[in-house]
């Protein structure tokens, strides 16, 4: 949380000198890969011996996957299932990255703006790639508005609106997670025992909310690119 584990700190320091990046960026890279490896191991454990009647890790993962899939279908409709791999991957990665910061000695990757920006750019590119693939060049009508003589003005406004989406996704997630880390650091500095516990419990709630908001906005943006322009 505040003091990284020695082994991971060693990797972070080596990476910092190798790539000439800041300590925060090096920590973000190391802990991002830590989360990725953790999720890969969890997936292998869950799928190692699949059973018709799931139990243990398989049962837990099926509940998570089914919950995300149902949410996608309820928000986007049946065609939203095709976007399940993208949205579920982002949601689970962000959630685990958020929760990792609550473990003493770990740094949440989402408390670094580079990590949140990467996730936001993926959503931004996916939104427009899906829109162009679905509508072809008619996708540009989304930027023109319903009145032809206002098209130049509407195009400018729509472009600004679309460019602001990855910025808002980036700063919302980064601001909340980084702010929570700073608050925890202050509480641990003042009273390192029981006082920070309420903030850590609130951190669990914040982690779930931020992952949910990011996933929900990703679904809304992609769904918007699929709708017919008027």
UniProtKB/Swiss-Prot annotation:
Major location (coarse): membrane
Compartmental location: Cell inner membrane
Classification via InterPro entries: ATP_syn_F0_a_bact/chloroplast, ATP_synth_F0_asu, ATP_synth_F0_asu_AS, F0_ATP_A_sf
SUPFAM superfamilies found in the cross-reference section: F1F0 ATP synthase subunit A (SSF81336)
Topology of the protein relative to the lipid bilayer: Multi-pass membrane protein
Domain of life: Bacteria
Transmembrane segments: 26-46, 83-103, 112-132, 143-163, 182-202, 203-223
CDD domains: ATP-synt_Fo_a_6
Pfam families noted in UniProt: ATP-synt_A (PF00119)
Keywords per UniProt: ATP synthesis, Cell inner membrane, Cell membrane, CF(0), Hydrogen ion transport, Ion transport, Membrane, Transmembrane, Transmembrane helix, Transport
GO cellular component, one term: plasma membrane
GO molecular-function terms, A-Z: proton-transporting ATP synthase activity, rotational mechanism
Gene Ontology BP annotations: proton motive force-driven plasma membrane ATP synthesis
UniProt entry tagged with the keyword Heme: no
PANTHER family found in the cross-reference section: ATP SYNTHASE SUBUNIT A, CHLOROPLASTIC (PTHR42823:SF3)
Functional note: Key component of the proton channel; it plays a direct role in the translocation of protons across the membrane.
Family: Belongs to the ATPase A chain family.
Quaternary organization: F-type ATPases have 2 components, CF(1) - the catalytic core - and CF(0) - the membrane proton channel. CF(1) has five subunits: alpha(3), beta(3), gamma(1), delta(1), epsilon(1). CF(0) has three main subunits: a(1), b(2) and c(9-12). The alpha and beta chains form an alternating ring which encloses part of the gamma chain. CF(1) is attached to CF(0) by a central stalk formed by the gamma and epsilon chains, while a peripheral stalk is formed by the delta and b chains.
Protein name: ATP synthase subunit a
Gene: atpB
């Amino acid at each position: 949380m505040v003091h990284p584990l020695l082994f991971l700190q060693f990797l972070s320091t080596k990476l910092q000198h190798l790539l000439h990046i800041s300590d925060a960026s090096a920590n973000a890279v190391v802990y991002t890969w830590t989360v990725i490896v953790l999720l890969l191991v969890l997936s292998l454990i869950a799928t190692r011996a699949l059973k018709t009647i799931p139990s243990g890790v398989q049962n837990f993962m099926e509940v998570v996957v089914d919950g995300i899939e149902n949410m996608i279908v309820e928000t986007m409709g049946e065609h939203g299932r095709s976007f399940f791999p993208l949205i579920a991957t982002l949601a689970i990665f962000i959630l685990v990255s958020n929760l990792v910061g609550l473990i003493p000695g770990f740094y949440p990757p989402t408390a670094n703006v580079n990590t949140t920006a990467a996730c936001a750019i993926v959503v931004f590119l996916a939104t427009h790639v899906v829109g162009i693939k679905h509508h072809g060049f008619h996708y540009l009508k989304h930027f023109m508005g319903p009145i032809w003589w206002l098209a130049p003005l509407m195009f400018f406004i729509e472009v600004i609106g679309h460019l602001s989406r990855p910025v808002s996704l980036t700063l919302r997630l980064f601001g909340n997670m980084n702010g929570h880390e700073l608050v925890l650091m202050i509480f641990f500095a003042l009273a390192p025992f029981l006082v920070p516990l309420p903030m850590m419990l609130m951190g669990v709630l914040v982690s779930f909310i931020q992952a949910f908001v990011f996933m929900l906005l990703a679904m809304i943006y992609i769904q918007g690119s699929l709708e017919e322009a008027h």
